[in-house]
Amino acid sequence: MTPSASPSPSPNPGDANVKVDADSPNDFILFSHELPSGDIQDLIRRLHRYGTLPGYPHLARFLQECALLLRTEIQKLPRALRDSVPPFHDVVTLASHWDRLKSGPLSGAWDGPFLCLYEIAMLIGHHETHQLSYRRPACLVGISVGLFSAAAVAVSKSISDLVSYGAESVRTAFAFCVHVQRVSQELEPTMTEQAASVSWATVVIGVPADTIQVELDRFNHLKESESPGANARPLTGVSISHVDQTSVGVTGPPSRLKQLFRQSELLRSSRHSALPISGGLCHVPNVYDDEDVRAILEMAEVWEKWGTRALQVPLISPFTGSPFLCPDAYHLIEAICTEALTKQLYFDKLAGGVVTQLNGLSCQVLHYGASLMSDTIIDDVTSQLSPCDTARQCLVDWALRDAFDQLPGGPTPPRDAKLAVVGMACRMPGGADTPDHFWELLMNGVDTHTTVPPDRFDLDAHFDPSGEKENTTTKGSQSNRPLSRQAEQTDPMQRLALVTAYEALEMAGFVPNRTPSSHLSRVGTYYGQASDDYREVNAGQKIGTYGIPGTERGFGNGRINYFFNFQGPSFNIDTACSSGLAAVQAACSALWAGEADTVVAGGLNVITSPDIYCMLSKGHFLSKTGQCKVWDIGADGYCRADGIGSVVIKRLDDALADNDVILACISAGATNHSAESISITQPHAAAQRENYRQVMDRAGVSPLDVSFVELHGTGTQVGDAVESESVLSFFAPLGRRSHPDKRLHLGAVKSNIGHGEAAAGIASLIKVLLMYRNNTIPRHIGIRTAMNPVVAQHLANRNAGILSENHPWLAATASKKRYAIVNSFGAHGGNTTLLLEDAPSQHSQRYKNHSRRVVASSEVVCTSAKSKASLRANIRALLAYLDTHQETDLRDLAYTTSARRMHHHIRIASSVTSTAQLRSFLQAAADDVDAYAKHIATATKRTAVFAFSGQGCLYHGAAAHLFEQAPLFRNQVLQLDRIVRRLGFPSILVTVAGDAASVYDSARCPHRESTPSSDASHDSNTNRTSTAPAVDSPLIAQLALVVIQIALVQYWGLLGIKPSVVIGHSLGEYAALVAASVLSVADALFLVGKRAELMLAVCEPGSHAMLSVRGASVDRIEELCRESEKRYPFEVSCVNGLTDLVVTGLRGDMASLRDLLQGSGLKCVLLDIPFAFHSKQMSPILEDFENAAQQITFQEPAVPVISPLLGKCISEANVINGKYLARATREPVDFVAALDSAWADGTVNDKSIWIDIGPHPVCTSFASNHYGKAATQSFASLRRGDETLSTLTATLAALHCLGLPVDWNEYYDLRENPARLLHLDSYQWNYKNYWIPYEGSWTLDKAHAGQNNKTKDDNSAVTPAFFTSSVQQIIFEEYDESMGRMEALSDLHHPDLQGAADGHKIHGRSVVTGSIWADITLTVGEYLYKQMVPGGKMPHMNVKGMEVLEAQVLHPDMSQFIQIEGVLDLPRQQTAVRLYAASANGTRNTDKPFASATVCYEEAQDWQDQWQMTSHLVAARANSFWEMAAGGSDDNARPAGKGGPRVNNFFRSIAYQLFANVVDYGARYRGMQRVALSEDTLEATADIVLDKDRHGTWHTPPHWIDSAFQLAGFVMNSFGVQGDGKISGSSRDFFYITPGWRHFRLLERLEPGPEATYRSFVRMFPVGSEPGAYSGDIYLHRGKRLVGVCAGIKFKAVPRALMPVLFPRIEPQAGKRRNQAQTAENRLVKGKGNCEYTHTVFQEPKSRTPAYDVTKSQPHAEHCDISISQKTQPVAAVPVTQPALPAKERGEQNQGQSQSQNAQATACLSLISDETGLDLDDLTGEAAFADLGVDSLMSLALSAKIRAELGIDVQSSIFLECPTVQDLVTWLSK
């Protein structure tokens, strides 16, 4: 609401200038503009601590209101900005993240609100500390943002007013700062830098303001002749922001400030320093206007919150030096925003303004501590008031005292917020697997009790009616049914807790991090559990891997938190029979205390143990006759029952804000104890009444207003009597409920389903929630014969009773709510009570009374699952819902299935316009799930390519429908239009939005009252309608296209889709550069507008034309022209495809050429464009355009830019500049070359997703035509003629199914067009049976078990554990305080280690490469350090002094073992590692090591400091090699230039063919993709991609190390260096081997695959002291970063004649290894699972990628498709379609697939299926093991089984190395 839309306050200038008389206070308050120096977090902590003390109630309330308002304002921000703010519930928590806030995308928005919070809080605390009455000062002074604090004081009459308006000033300051930062970032993005350190202002000392202004005018080019048609003062200009006696402040974009002080000799030589202003531009006349002020006022709701409040105290303007002349608070805030945005600060004027408001002989200055600016102003006031005495009072001193010696005034009372129950789920007896089924059971009066099922235990064996048999029960009834099964080692209670939690969250529409209350760090779990039957009886018989996490109580909650990634509290609570409701009450307390924002709570009970029956029977708890007979005369105890229930609860305000469906509200809750009962198990009426009183008093509700009480109602004589007394005496006292409408109804669900013990309370709560939903009270079936006379006596004359028939429960009205009580009492004496009430009436009516905008639009409906079976069932459930709810609104359904669902990795989605169309789609999908389902693989990453079309796709109103229907997009367009107009160009709104623009164009400049605060001289050139060109002018058209494209980029970003790569065609490249952060928004629009103006000024419209030609190449066109024997002068402007061209020339020539080509059967179109772009017509504007672009700042691309001008991908800075844009204007657009380059270098591939950014898809069609439709997946944003936005919704549906993270919550703007959350059917689980049955009757005689068992004496040795592939067995360890020592034994013929050696052959023999010794050294170094410093930060390791004295050559006919010794000297921070030849028993063959090295533990920063000087030099030298090698071939050297070295360029195959002259590398070692080598200088550089497979368990796989650093060996051995140091063409005389290196350092772990490309460089030098020896340093870069160095690597010459001697060839002979070797291998491989020690295995971190289909069960448990050990996280996408392959490649692929399906693979998959319970159908293709539930524990178990049963040597990391089924099958086939 704004003043123009509401009754405007009457201006009364006479009241605005508040006068003070002689008796008024003679003091003033100075509000600073900057936060105090020092620790802001400590200041806020101090304020928070004072706020907890009893003497500071106003301070406490102020801090609470600030937190609430900031949370509200943050929710208004786009998702990306919201997510950058950590969750907080109070300001101290928010302030604790200060460093994170100041480095995030809102870095500049926090100083302002925290300044206001600080200033107001200090002022309030000052009054409360000194117990001062609130006294208004004579006047106020504020500077910049400090004016908002001053405004709060200016309108406050009391300290209470100051609390309210102070909090509003914080809100307004936040809105102001957010707006300033957003606008400033559009002028120059600084978020890519360390934002907090970027300064937008500089102070210059000692130079007059007039002199500085002259310099600024010169710098800003303020000569109209230099900027024809453009704004005289560019948005990015530098201007003066403040002036005082000694200094002048200048402000502007950071890069422009740097240029200013570089170019201006005057300013460069002056005294100047940067100001700590990181938020953006303020006090500038050239950037903001009234629209900005209005936007801030609307965002902060200033009219609604400040309104017509009168000013109480004059506030001095720092611009005029006089009081603001404003009639009310609204206009005061408006004036402050205007001044803070657009007016300069004149501090010299402030003193005079203050003096005019003061009188008397003394005055007091209240200030916020010393600062240069404050001291200057106060000194000026003091000097002008002389001889008046001026006293100073610091408002901060009170908070800086360290003495918090005041005692708190008791505990802080619970917050009075009501809570909302928004979700529920259950598994109850009688088949009640859903709340709806549970309700049917209650309405039908079903008694569910039955005998104990045989799968629990043998009832005949454990039942003894006499009660005399030991460990038997006399009661055998149980009220349950076999529920669902799952993984047998996990307690069914834990499985069902997870299942029902999921279903309750699904009903609640919970999506992680969707809103503040759903932030994962603010969600907790609370469950009640009172027994461990399954652990004690069932799982204890078959203890396995999951024994502990599957059965210990804490894991029940922990598994839910882990699965969903909840980071809030997790409590498992046992209060006997009341555990479930006590857990709910504890969860409510957490919400009231602010410990969580959302809680999942419930109760768990699954009965499997006969022992508990026995105990309860012996204790006389159980009924001998069946079901609980609550209040029946024959009540004799209770019937035990299974039960699981979960509810989701939030604070009511959060639920309303989150658009949740509220089932009911919880007003209050309490738990107490019956301490005065005569027996611990006997209830106590007085304690129960006290419990009720606590609840009702806390809620402030009369007991007489309660209309229903759900009793605990166990059905015992004592319990029924006591509870009836306590309930009726409190809620229905005699004579008090006389009115018929006040009747109290009673009920007890135990009469239907029995006593669920720990689940009893949650069952009662769910029953009452269902009553609220269905407006009915179910009948009570507990009285089977007659009522208990004691109960009847209590009921008499109280207008209370029990219903024997279902009874309507009238829904709440505006004047009357329904209140209900839920009781639950524990046998241990605990009493828990909750008070429930109706959801707010305005909530239930909000949609009925809201008239939606009637817009025909498409909607996206989607569903997903963890398995195809569940997906099919989910689809059918959705169809069934549509059948039974034919009135369903399509938007509600779309909103529910997209924005309010957690999405799984098997998905379907469709864009539809009607429910009939949806029904058709769903039916087809249900009939053929395989055809419709899209599988999202966690292991595949997708690239999103944004393609920006050129001007030819624009048409009038191109984005009209999206503008009208999508507020997010509309807001972007309106903001961009404002920038266009501020740049001096005409509005583009009509061109973009068509007729819809008129509504918003008129709203942009509404009639506003003129007030004294308005400055008539404020320049504004935003309204140029009188001189604006026609809508279809080239200027408007070009600006409009770029505005649409930029707005689409921003819109897609808000929806969660951001580009990985961008490509722009012609004009579209400007928007592409904005998307890549090369250009700011303002700069891009300036350049586009400037270019268009130059065209209009210089070029003649219509003189030239552009002709689109399809179906012919350039050669064909030229051929046709020659054949015609006529001259058709043309030039090629665009190469869109091999036969899709645009040619240009004079219009007449193009018309003739068109006729010629059409006559030859070609399709030609003359484009309706006034200019011929990319032709010689553009030449006259190039120089002026390039000059205009020189003032623009070009940033380094944030994502690769595919350049159609250069035909390559650009990732580095300084390539795109003004010259580039000038060339792009004139030179042709070669889209084909750009596409080819992007594919060749891997920037795009067949998995890339192409999104066309423009009014109509053009560029994506170019890509599809060029690559082939099978190799591209392209989608459009808009399409001409699409009025329902079906193009956009279809794209959203497709992107969702491809796994891109669509933010559906942002897509739905509920403020403008609300949607309702529907309660659809819950997830359809794919149940499978898993259950460990209780065998026999061993519990009957367990006390005597084992008396006859003989004790076994097992002295067999335990085989040491397998450690890694290179350090296989640790056979000895010892440690003391400073030293650690270990010995390990490894078999060189172990498959992993032998495989590594086999990849490095010399003369046909496998030789252990030095990279294996490096891995061993790193492994030992890390292991010892972690053992000696457990939990400490692992430093980086430098492998120094590697010396290999003897090569290890593998012999196939003998065993070969090595012993590894490591000795850690902790004080010296180093580990000595020595390697010895050894026997199979670990004995060394010799005391002389064959290799040794030292690991030194060092700091990475020291390395980086050392490398800083050389890194860029090395990189530059390597780059120059590639430039010199350009144009060469594999076998032809190219001269590098005059006097330069000859450089040869080799690709992978040739390089390793040359290498094979000495070393024959296996495939895994062939990481060098290409090499550039100079024989002259022994230099080389190589581009490297590491093999994706680790091939074992390693610290750093040897084939990775070798690939990264083998370049030196290539230099020495590829051509050969002779013994005299000369180089020859081959290695015929010598070959070179390396004995080691000086040091080896890796800054980071190596990463495999094309995503991590490395570049190495080396230069080898002769070692003067060693003839035939060479040494060099190998440098390894990843991108621009130096990540590794192997320094001093040495190679020694060996005569080639010795090669057959050193490495004699041996023909392979099978089966020659001796028995000793076989025994040792068995010991090392087969004995891995039987380990005595536990060691950390060095391998990649275990993936925690989710699989939603968590295994969930109900008792007797079914297994559904949720993996219990996984958590939910986003997943990456896989391609929907695979690219077509040539026939030969298809044949090879099919052959490979055929070979992979061998018996070994089949057996392995069958074993995995057996062990996991997965169907073989699930183990196909791209199915990811992580998604299927294979976690770290399961990986260990499966790998052990595969080794033991199939004899396949696999490590537990196999499922990380082969993340999908296809990966594993491929690996097995190898």
From Swiss-Prot:
Chain intervals for the UniProt region annotation (Malonyl-CoA:ACP transacylase (MAT) domain): 947-1282
Enzyme Commission (EC) number: 2.3.1.-
CDD domains in alphabetical order: PKS
Biological process according to GO: fatty acid biosynthetic process; secondary metabolite biosynthetic process
Role: Non-reducing polyketide synthase; part of the pkg gene cluster that mediates the biosynthesis of dihydrocitreoisocoumarin and 6,8-dihydroxy-3-(2-oxopropyl)-isocoumarin. The non-reducing polyketide synthase pkgA performs the condensation of one acetyl-CoA starter unit with 6 and 5 malonyl-CoA units, respectively. As pkgA lacks a releasing domain, the thioesterase pkgB is necessary to break the thioester bond and release dihydrocitreoisocoumarin and 6,8-dihydroxy-3-(2-oxopropyl)-isocoumarin from pkgA.
Record's comment describing the protein's domains: Multidomain protein; including a starter unit:ACP transacylase (SAT) that selects the starter unit; a ketosynthase (KS) that catalyzes repeated decarboxylative condensation to elongate the polyketide backbone; a malonyl-CoA:ACP transacylase (MAT) that selects and transfers the extender unit malonyl-CoA; a product template (PT) domain that controls the immediate cyclization regioselectivity of the reactive polyketide backbone; and an acyl-carrier protein (ACP) that serves as the tether of the growing and completed polyketide via its phosphopantetheinyl arm.
Protein name: Non-reducing polyketide synthase pkgA
Organism (species): Emericella nidulans (strain FGSC A4 / ATCC 38163 / CBS 112.46 / NRRL 194 / M139) (Aspergillus nidulans)
Gene assigned in the entry: pkgA
